[in-house]
Design a protein with these regions (language model features):
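An alpha-helical repeat/solenoid feature that recognizes helix-turn-helix modules
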Residues: 1-57, 62-95, 111-142
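C-terminal closing repeat unit and adjoining cap/tail of repeat-based domains
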Residues: 92-104
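Large, well-folded core regions of big proteins
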Residues: 105-110
Length: 142
């Protein structure tokens, strides 16, 4: 049943020309939606699915530190690329790591991130992303 539902994604919510995912059929694809979609596919065991690979290419193409849903999108894009592994993960981590370091704010000894979703959530999400290669969380242990 899951395979049938997943295969329906291509015709319903993935943009044929851009390869990103939309929220609803016929909608515009977006960075955060694509990140959540390819991570969800991987969680369902579709690690090598062409939708995941195409979605990853879309995320590299559309990456922007000015993205409206930057934190939310990267909270899913980072583990999706981590699961892809190899050079893809290495390139993604260099890209997101450099971006997050530039966006970090300093208040004395305190380093944090801010955004429209709030300082606490942004800091927790970005610290989790930066910590992925250190395998602190069991989810990211290999």
């Amino acid at each position: 049943k899951n395979n049938k539902q997943i295969s329906g994604l291509r015709s319903k919510v993935q943009s044929e020309e851009e390869k990103g995912f939309a929220y609803q059929p016929g909608g515009k694809p977006g960075f955060a939606r694509t990140a959540a979609a390819i991570y969800s596919l991987q969680v369902c065991g579709k690690y090598d699915d062409p939708l995941v690979k195409a979605g990853s290419r879309y995320l590299f193409k559309k990456f922007s530190s000015g993205e409206r849903w930057f934190t939310y999108g990267n909270y899913y894009a980072a583990p999706a690329h981590y699961m892809i592994g190899g050079e893809t993960w290495k390139r993604w981590y260099e890209l997101i790591g450099a971006t997050l370091k530039k966006r970090a704010k300093q208040d004395g000894e305190l380093t944090y991130w801010s955004g429209d979703i709030g300082r606490i959530y942004s800091t927790a999400a970005h610290a989790t992303i930066l910590a992925m290669p250190y395998h602190y969380l069991p989810l990211y242990q290999r």
